[in-house]
Amino acid sequence: MSLFEELKWRNLITECSDEKRAKLLLDGNKKIKFYCGFDATAGSLTVGHLVQIITFLLIQKKGHFPIVLLGGATSFIGDPKKIEERKLLDPSQILDNFNKISLQFKKILSFISFEIVNNYDWISKIDVINFLRKYGKLFNINYMLSKEVIANRLKKGLSYAEFSYMVLQSLDFQYLFEHKNVIMQFGGSDQWGNITSGLELIRKINKIKDNDKPVGMTNALLLKSDGTKFGKSEDGVLWLDQKLTSPYKIYQYFLNTEDKEVVNYLKSLTLLSKKEIINLKEENIVNPQKRLAQKILAKEIITLIHGKKIFENCFNTNQALFVGKKDQLSEQSFYFLKYTLNYIEVNDKISLLEALVFTKLTNSKNKAKELISNHAIKIFDQIVDDTELILNIKHSLFNKYILLKKGKRFNALIIFK
């Protein structure tokens, strides 16, 4: 299977400006430079960006050279949102975001060669007069108005600043084409209008022969089971920065992937081969209760983002929660759980009844007594039958944490200050 065919099979190509040319570039003997852009409008990448990262890695594996473009300039404006105007960020915030995202890419892509560029380096050098004369004259207003996101926002109001974003982003492709011999751009499907505008700008400025023609393509946006995307502005966003989203929360999310979604996620979020993915699909059909595809999916994603050691901590934490293996809990496990479970902080002691109510494992002390009497409550992996029990640091692990369990699915923490 060719690289182009593999990307299509993985649903990593939705739109393509020239499929014949893309096949030639991706599967030819000549190695190319390609890029994808990311704005620094937040201090972390999200799970949704893994689609682009996997695309990077698959194309790089063929020997092509990837460039990560960070929008140090375009982040001052922001890509038009579907519904409302973006709030402008302070320059210091953009710089901080830029530095954090740069570090994330260097960590996640540490095992390959790639380059990070900042579009502030060239866009900031263009004055207003030259911007309008050299570039503004090349953009037709009717063409820009035909773009879906612009057309939708016009009904609700759109500033000139956000309207100009398309022009600014187009400069990126033109600059990289001219100065770094970049021949291909890809991005999320919501970037198709900006990508084609960049191709159009290159065509108008440069006298291009067929064998120098650049190509643009898009990936389908990563969607949750409810149809919403994993975006920065969405509710329940899953950040790749473990200070913002616990790795265990991401692990749990993909461990709970529905059967109808798991194969699509394996294709677009992992580097597993087609044969491996098909085998996992068949295994899930034969033994759905084992959920092997979901387990491998969660493992691959956490290992890519955070490394093998943190995956092992996530796995052990899950074993302790749902299989009852207390000895597999590490201090880092509790750090993960603090950002995943309900918890209460206490000074030296608390009654079990109060703890069950305060952590919302139940809504009353009477109900708590009933649960204890029915042997439905555990401290770590030990069933509790004493309704008068007072919990203190002696019951804890690492002199700090107590794990409360209700049945097989519900857990909470007590943390000693």
UniProtKB/Swiss-Prot annotation:
Matches recorded under Gene3D superfamilies: HUPs (3.40.50.620), RNA-binding S4 domain (3.10.290.10), Tyrosyl-Transfer RNA Synthetase (1.10.240.10)
Residues reported in the UniProt entry to bind L-tyrosine: 35, 165, 169
UniProt short sequence motif 'KMSKS' region, positions renumbered to this chain: 229-233
Top-level taxon in the UniProt lineage: Bacteria
UniProt key word Protein transport: no
Catalytic function, reaction form: tRNA(Tyr) + L-tyrosine + ATP = L-tyrosyl-tRNA(Tyr) + AMP + diphosphate + H(+)
Enzyme Commission identifier(s): 6.1.1.1
Protein localization: Cytoplasm
A GO molecular-function descriptor: tyrosine-tRNA ligase activity
Binding residues for ATP: 232
Keywords (A to Z) from UniProt: Aminoacyl-tRNA synthetase, ATP-binding, Cytoplasm, Ligase, Nucleotide-binding, Protein biosynthesis, RNA-binding
GO cellular component, one term: cytosol
Subunit comment: Homodimer.
Family affiliation: Belongs to the class-I aminoacyl-tRNA synthetase family. TyrS type 1 subfamily.
Free-text function comment from the UniProt entry: Catalyzes the attachment of tyrosine to tRNA(Tyr) in a two-step reaction: tyrosine is first activated by ATP to form Tyr-AMP and then transferred to the acceptor end of tRNA(Tyr).
Protein's UniProt name: Tyrosine--tRNA ligase
Organism expressing this protein natively: Phytoplasma mali (strain AT)
